Amino acid sequence: MQLYAVQQNSIYTLKPNDPEAFYFTPENYQIKADGKMDVSDALQAAINQVKKEKNFGILFIPEGKYKISKTIYVPGSIRLIGYGKKRPEFILAKNSPGFQEEVSIDKGKANYMFWFTSSLVEKGQVPRDANAGTFYSAMSNINLRIEDGNPHAVALRTHYAQHSFISYVTIYIGKGKAGLFDVGNEMENVAFYGGDYGIYTTKASPGWPVMMVDSYFEGQRV
């Protein structure tokens, strides 16, 4: 019997029909959702395509397992939403480059699976963190997993503002550092398993307090 508030089933079991959205499918991006193929570059390209072509919008992620090995940047007003009988899962591969040592020049002293930024990040550009003017960014109905060998990995960096959220996400931090660094606006139905921390944070973006609803923490080491 489940004795805690979060529910971990997929809340979007059918493919949404949205002619304005983009879909991260093998047909569109030549990827495999098998947990073996590294989809990092294809995923970043898909996110950037939404931003460039629409400026705001949704990238739908079908059920499956998606291996990544580097930070994925999500610019303002872009949402990643999963669908299927089971939630899709993004997996940070074992011993991914850059996740073994503390990042001394970074605000959170870490590297991130997904970093919500204020603007588009092209290859070679320095990311600009989300801020009080970063609206509508989100991730929903997607699970995240950090595999072994990534002690300074954090699943999400979320310093965004109004209408932005994380919802219906289970984060398997394992031996990584944390599930989330820098809170923003709202999180709902998020579960954190393992890690040194579930969440560690500085202040929220100015003017936007944070609401946490129906979330769960288990097995943090600190």
Can you name each region flagged by the protein language model?
Residues 65:
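Mobile, glycine-rich extracellular loop/lid and propeptide segments
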Residues 1-60, 68-147, 152-155, 159-167, ...:
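Extracellular "leader-to-stem" segments immediately downstream of a signal peptide or signal-anchor
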